[in-house]
A protein has these predicted regions:
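Proline-centered structural pivot motif
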Residues: 63-64, 88, 92, 107-148
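Extracellular acidic, Ser/Thr/Pro-rich low-complexity tracts
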Residues: 175-184, 233, 597, 813-815, ...
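Glycine-aliphatic tripeptides that mark coil-to-beta-strand junctions in extracellular
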Residues: 97-105, 109
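Primarily the internal scaffold of c-type cytochrome electron-transfer domains
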Residues: 133-134, 254-267, 294-319, 350-695, ...
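Proline-enriched interdomain boundary motifs that mark the N-terminal boundary
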Residues: 151-160, 791-796
Length: 882
């Protein structure tokens, strides 16, 4: 009798569990949502005919899981920040997650002013089609609050400026108004017209109805200005009022040239009309950091100068001088150094004074991953890009000059098609190419236009927008991206495994291959392990500023990440050039130094002022006493000697005689970059694939120097003292010279930032140069100047290179003795000894058939060959490519 009774009890318990299942089995976040807003239970936020008890309040998939809509994502971020589920729900209720003009609280709870509420706080007409496991037509009436009984717009009155006022550009003035409505005023926006009301641009958005606002008057002088105040009531009705008559914005006094913001207006996303970027330290870090510092996006990005672009005191001190020289020119700088602050209108003060701590996170995650290619290619770019491009008044002609476009919606884009993210995501070919990099790494000054002569640039009409926004019709400030486009890296790719990371073939072709090299790891804490994860280190050439950022912005940096980033910079610099010494001595000591550019752009490249590379040559006599030095650097004073033999690689922009006469300046090389209109010299080493014609086309010609087409190296000859018997050569790189830091200190008449930078520079060690490569050589002389030249020790470059299946190695031996030529793989392991025997002085060659000591064919890759003879040793690289 007991067994049936026991079975009946199980059935009863199971039935009770089933009856209780809907409430108990709910997602805990959904439970918290309904605890906060019980009126939402049974509404469309929990039930629609095609999906009862759904999770569509937070997820695009109404069955739950997968990508969250903007409201669900905001809650997830709050939970990841340590809040309970209920605390997280309540913490975002005053936000407008879907950016439709209504707070989450209004959408979920305000059933008085609207006829269709509750509405979905994370869905809009722009993203609702992403929803799944639901009939979308059932959602369309519940995206934005509407249908209220209040259809009367607010009463709005502009009090001031209302006509006749005169305000100075870059001053702060009070805008005042009244706005009232029976449903209350939800928000107030301000707009300015400089055409007597014919067209308006936003100057402030989302203000509370305080009746006044401290308005920073942009540097857009004119006499036809009017202000519009737009108020939205709690029922979604809009009312507005404008100034009754024009008011004046007076020109800004000062500046070497009378530029205004109009001179630096460019197409693309505009302030207060684009994206509101997320704070990466509150959002991105929750999934993309804290699990693998070696490769995770967060830690590696935190160590890059991209993350600190707006914290860089060197940049900030430079921008002060630019603003002194050409008022409003800081706008061009802020575009790419704080794209978040720029888009949100905190660039109206072009000195950067309005920038916040969040803005100082520089070139941050949300900026890059919401970028839209301005040049739409059907079948390549996401179709979601089209309406974004269509909404812009002026499309950028190309990817350059900070003319970026950001998706106004919080939709991330990236290079992988198989991402399972908690946020909205689009596979983007743009994010797999170098085109994105060109946006901020081809910089031109739009205050200048191309003149009639070669390499001639003339000022445009001041206080007017550039006529065509074509970077080729402006003065070139930086051409790193364009230099890459004309290199062999961009055309065919180059076998360069030292840069290639995990790329199995070792071929490097894009900017990303070197500056975001492939590594193995996860892009997010729960993501798959990828062998082609782009490392977000974004390493460049600035190795000293990471040491001083914390001094200027305490508490805003990660010291470990910056130290890691600095080391990556040094490592990259030491891969960027190859140094070769050739003994050219006959009767007197002499030396040839060959520097080969291994990068995909000029070496050095990037921002030109104060950046340089040089060859330091030291010669010693038989007793190893120093008897000669060229391009000597004093590490105690940071002075570099400019002796007659000194080879210093740099670009020297400056002021032409033509412009100097016009502006009353001294002609010649100058650090006043925003006033520069000519290049006085440029002897930087071109990349592989260089031709003079192509580099002229991209406005990066060789100036006052000479490189032949196809040349990506430079050779410098040194006549040494008669007593010289050996030499030591070091190739140095310095990202900031003493002269430039002193310039920033001495020319600053605005504040003491230049002095602060100088003091920090001294404390740091004065940006001591990095040794990119070092080599030494013994010099072999004939007995007398008239003797027949002796053979010299020399190891030639193998031919062909790359090779398959065999290659020839030539070498010279200065005196009789043992000679050894050996092959090593990239890990330094001996592959084969080609020669190991006594030889007389003379010229020789050996051939390698691409086989190891056992006669087995070796695999493709990088190999080293080494020559050892009496008093001489040299090693070179070669590539076997099958």
């Amino acid at each position: 009798m007991r067994r049936p009774s026991w079975s009946l009890s199980l059935v009863s318990i199971s039935l009770l569990l089933l009856l209780a299942l809907p409430a108990a089995a709910r997602n805990p976040i959904k439970n918290a949502f309904l605890d906060a807003y019980p009126n939402a239970d049974g509404s469309v936020l929990t039930d629609v005919p095609s999906s009862s008890s759904h999770c569509g309040a937070c997820h695009f998939d109404f069955d739950g899981g997968g990508a969250r809509n903007p409201y669900g994502l905001a809650i997830e971020i709050a939970i990841n920040g340590g809040m309970s589920n209920l605390e997280a729900v309540l913490s975002v209720e005053n936000e407008d997650s879907d950016n439709d003009g209504f707070s989450n609280l209004v959408e979920v709870t305000d059933t008085v002013n609207f006829g269709n509420t509750p509405t979905f706080p994370g869905l809009t007409s722009g993203n609702v089609n992403t929803s799944s496991n639901v009939i979308i037509a059932e959602l369309l009436d519940y995206l934005t609050p509407s249908g209220g009984s209040d259809t009367t717009p607010p009463d709005v009155l502009v009090i001031g400026p209302n006509g006749g006022e005169s305000y100075g550009a870059t001053t702060t003035q009070t805008v005042s108004w009244t706005a009232s409505d029976a449903s209350g005023i939800a928000s107030v926006d301000l707009y300015l017209s400089d055409e007597s009301g014919e067209g308006y641009k936003p100057v402030a958005k989302g203000l509370t109805n305080t009746g006044s606002f401290d308005w920073f008057v942009q540097n857009r002088p004119g006499v036809n200005n009017r202000l519009k105040v737009v108020a939205r009531d709690g029922a979604g009705n809009y009312g507005d009022d404008t100034s009754d008559a024009d008011f004046i914005i007076d020109p800004l006094a000062g500046g070497v040239v009378p530029t205004t913001l109009r001179d630096f207006d460019l197409p693309g996303t505009q302030p207060l009309e684009g994206a509101i970027l997320e704070d990466p330290s509150a959002t991105c870090i929750t999934c993309h950091g804290g699990y693998d510092e070696a490769v995770e996006p967060w830690h590696t990005w935190q160590g890059s100068m991209m993350a600190h672009a707006q914290r860089d005191p060197h940049f900030l001190a430079t921008m002060v001088i630019a603003e002194q020289d050409a008022p409003a020119s800081g706008d061009l700088c802020l575009r790419c150094h704080t794209p978040g602050g720029w888009q949100e209108g905190r660039s109206f003060d072009t000195s950067g004074a309005m920038v916040t701590a969040v803005d100082r996170q520089g070139v941050q995650c949300d900026f890059c991953h919401r970028m839209v290619d301005p040049v739409y290619v059907e079948g390549v770019n996401p179709v979601e890009d089209l309406p974004i491009l269509d909404d812009l008044d002026d499309l950028p002609p190309t990817q350059a000059n900070g003319m970026f476009i950001n998706d106004p919606a919080p939709v991330k884009r990236g290079p992988y098609p198989d991402v399972d993210a908690s946020h909205q995501f689009l596979d983007s070919a743009f994010h797999r190419t170098s085109l994105l990099c060109g946006t901020c790494h081809d910089v031109s000054n739009p205050a200048f236009e191309l003149g009639s002569g070669p390499n001639e640039y003339v000022p445009g009409n001041f206080d007017e927008e550039h006529p065509d926004a074509d970077l080729r019709n402006m003065f070139p400030v930086e051409r790193t991206y364009s230099e890459w486009t004309q290199s062999e890296y961009a055309s065919t790719g180059v076998y360069a495994p030292q840069f290639a990371g995990n790329k199995p073939d070792g071929i490097v072709s894009s900017c990303l291959d070197c500056h975001m090299r492939d590594v193995s790891g996860r892009g997010a804490d729960s993501g798959p392990v990828r062998a082609d994860l782009g490392m977000h280190d974004l390493t460049g050439g600035n190795y000293w500023v990471p040491d001083i950022i914390e001094t200027f912005f305490p508490g805003e940096t990660d010291a470990v990440a910056l130290a890691d980033g600095k080391q990556r910079v040094i490592d990259l610099l030491q891969l960027s050039a190859t140094l070769e010494l050739i003994d050219t001595s006959g009767g007197t000591p002499s030396l040839q130094v060959k520097v080969t550019n291994e990068t995909g752009h000029k070496l050095p490249s990037g921002y030109p002022e104060g950046r340089r590379m040089w060859i330091n040559v030291k010669a010693y006599d038989e007793g190893m006493a120093l008897i000669y030095e060229s391009a000597a650097y004093d590490f105690g004073s940071a002075d570099l000697s400019h002796d007659a033999d000194a080879k210093i690689y740099e670009i020297e922009p400056g002021t032409s005689y033509r412009l100097a006469d016009l502006l009353g300046l001294e002609p010649g090389p100058s650090f006043h970059f925003v006033l520069n209109d000519t290049i006085w010299s440029d002897n930087r080493i071109p990349p592989r694939g260089f031709t003079n014609a192509n580099f002229q086309t991209i406005q990066s010609p060789v100036v006052n120097y000479s490189y032949a087409d196809g040349q990506y190296w430079d050779e410098t000859d040194y006549a040494l003292p008669a007593a010289a018997r050996s030499a030591e050569v070091t190739l140095y790189y310095q990202s900031t010279s003493k002269e430039y830091v002193e310039f920033l200190r001495d020319e600053n008449t605005t504040n003491d930032l230049g002095l602060q930078l100088y003091d920090a520079w001294v404390t740091q060690g004065m940006a001591a140069p990095v040794a990119m490569a070092t080599s030494s050589i013994d010099l072999n002389l004939t007995d007398a100047p008239g003797d027949t030249p002796a053979y010299r020790n020399h190891l030639g470059q193998n031919l062909p290179n790359p090779f398959n299946p065999s290659t020839k190695i030539s070498f010279s031996q200065a005196e009789a003795g043992w000679a050894r030529v050996a092959i090593y793989d990239s890990a330094g392991r001996l592959v084969k000894v080609l020669l190991d025997q006594h030889r007389n002085a003379g010229d020789y060659e050996v051939r390698w058939m691409g086989r190891d000591a056992s006669g087995v064919k070796v695999s493709s890759g990088l190999y080293f060959y080494q020559l050892e003879t009496p008093g001489y040793s040299a090693t070179k690289k070669m590539v076997l490519l099958k």
